[in-house]
Amino acid sequence: MDGRNERPTTPVSDFRVGSSEQSQAGVNLEDSSDYRTSNSAESKKGNLSGKSISDLGISNNDNKNVRFTADTDALENDLSSRSTETSDNSKGTDGQGEEDRPARHKRKPKVSFTHLRNNGKDGDDETFIKKIINNLTGNQGGLVPGLAPIPSENENGKDDIEKNNRNEEIPLSDLADASKIVDVHEGDNKEKLEALKLESDVNCTSDGETLGSSSKNSFLAPAVDHFDDYAENNSSDDNEGFIETSTYVPPPSQVKSGVLGSLLKLYQNEDQNSSSIFSDSQAVTTDDEGISSTAGNKDVPVAKRSRLQNLKGKAKKGRMPRLKKRLKTEAKITVHIADILQRHRFILRMCRALMMYGAPTHRLEEYMVMTSRVLEIDGQFLYLPGCMIVSFGDATTRTSEVQLVRCTQGLNLWKLHQVHAVYKRVVHDTLGADEGNALLDQILADTNLYPPWMCVLLYAFCSAMVTPYAFGGDWVNLAISFFMGLCVGSLQFILSQKSYMYSNVFEISASIVVSFCGRAFGSIPRSHICFGAVTQGSLALILPGYIILCGALELQSRSLVAGAVRMFYAIIYSLFLGFGITLGSALFGWMYHNATNEISCPQLISPWFRFLFVPAFTISISLLNQAHISQLPVMVFISCTGYVVTYWAGKHFANSTEFTAALAAFVIGVLGNLYSRIWKGLAVSAMLPAIFVQVPSGIASQNSLLSGLQSANTIVNANETITTSTSDPSSSMSFGMTMIQVCVGISVGLFASSLFVYPFGKKKTGLFSL
């Protein structure tokens, strides 16, 4: 053991570098190009060059993990097998060869220790050197973890304590996900930050002073899939978007980072400065210790880290230019955050406007996805009846912001046209998000074209016009339908708007009032008032035809949750109407025993006169839904064409309501989509009045709405109780089933027409069609 202390020792750091050829030829390892120490002569003298192995304070008690090999040949075989295993496991995960790797990623040549076997004359010395060799060649670093060879899987060249101290039994695939996350956060700034690292070492500036001069890669760097408009390098190659490519607009190759990520970038410099000082202070050692306690951080040599302790006292060169650069970066980040907030606000307001003004519900998610893609926002959308769940993702911080857009769904054809115009301008990049927000705010703040009192008159006129062509009423019934429509319109547009409690029972109360008054007018002797025509005509506008149509379209477009909820609600809604009609008729029958029992009109007007009432009904119902006068010609033309198809198809297919509705809806859809494709109009606003014409016609073809009247006649004539009306479930359910048949046929025809005109969909904007 005395000979060990007398002979000159080789610095411990010499064991980790240098090729076997250099070692055997007697080349000094300190002059090797792979020698990983500082270039400063002072650091070489102050750290390891003057220390021997015995002076490191290593005792036999510390050698708990030392592997003893009694045979020298076994040692050589063990070393050769370990070197082969290390070379196999140290290949890059990206499949690059040794020649394709960057200079800083290439593996260091393994040190050949075979020439050291016979250097010592004492057997104890040889055994002790073997212990050191066995531990140095292991993956865990043995006695001195900082001197272990750097594995090539540490591609980033960063401090990775978890990899350095990991157990050999843990497969490398367990760390694949974490490695991917780190690679994504580093982004395209690896070469840039390496250059800045060298520059910061030359200038002797403080680590963490600015983002650009930091010698450590920023964990919050822009991700590969994102870019910041204030970053110097925002280029990316073939990056895939986050949103699935099931719709027409391809996902953007780059999306904006979120607000939280930008805010963290704003305060990243201060956080990095404090954290770097704390972490580096633990790695700094005194000259008496000679070696760092955290030498396992293999990328930073001990000599370089030892001079970090006095950097704060040195003069900082070029501080003012860096401060100006930092202030400029903060200003750009502030502008970036404002732009992101404007885009988020535009998406939310566009969603609210589309829901309030009657956009096709089965295409709402498609519209919002396309809008977010054009605005380069990572957004996910889920539509439920009455609300839209919006999630704005931020992959930089692995967080998301969830917004709930909830509003009462209505129908406003003119405002829908205006919102669609803003949507098209933003999608085609002719209007910014901030200007779009201003326009949407103005549209939302504008009042309706027609006040409530005018809507009441239009409702009454619609009831009068639908009675002759749909339910067979004569000229006398027009006045009665107008009067009862006036009552229903007052309940809907005046009383329901003022009382929230009454709005929940509006449908039942309206059906009770209409059936009661209709039977009262029909019981007047020699009045020629048709009880069934005036009752159905007055209730035609509150039929759940549009609700069932939206549900059928959603189910056909695979929106199962929204479609199922809407369909079930429409069926229950139909049962409410049927119950109200039965109850109102029975009430008047109990009060007046000579009440009329006729549910069909004895006198019918000429079928050719019916065609005159269709355009009048189309105009009135379009104005009732807040359509502009400029939109009326196209609506009237499409509506009249659809009714002509319905009338002649009903002559040939008398017992097939759904087939007749499908043919008419196909013609309506083709005309509406051609209007959108050729004249660049809004197809949904032109098609909706024509669809409203089809629903009452389909209902009247089977007289399903009169099932409640038939039940009321049975109650009055047989002097039975109301419980008799529930004995025949087929009569109470027939109205809802007829509505479903008509709307399913309409939905099939509309989808077929969209496929006929737009076989491949639209390239950039959503298809604003039913």
Swiss-Prot record:
Sequence similarity: Belongs to the ThrE exporter (TC 2.A.79) family.
Protein name in UniProt: Pheromone-regulated membrane protein 10
Ranges where the record places region Disordered: 1-125, 139-169
Keyword Ribonucleoprotein assigned: no
Biased composition (Basic and acidic residues): 155-169
GO cellular component: membrane
Taxonomy, superkingdom: Eukaryota
Taxon lineage: Eukaryota, Fungi, Dikarya, Ascomycota, Saccharomycotina
Primary gene name: PRM10
GO molecular function, one term: transmembrane transporter activity
Amino acid composition bias (Polar residues), ranges on this chain: 49-63, 78-93
Keyword annotations: Membrane, Transmembrane, Transmembrane helix
Record-annotated membrane-spanning stretches: 453-473, 475-495, 505-525, 529-549, 568-588, 604-624, 629-649, 659-679, 681-701, 740-760
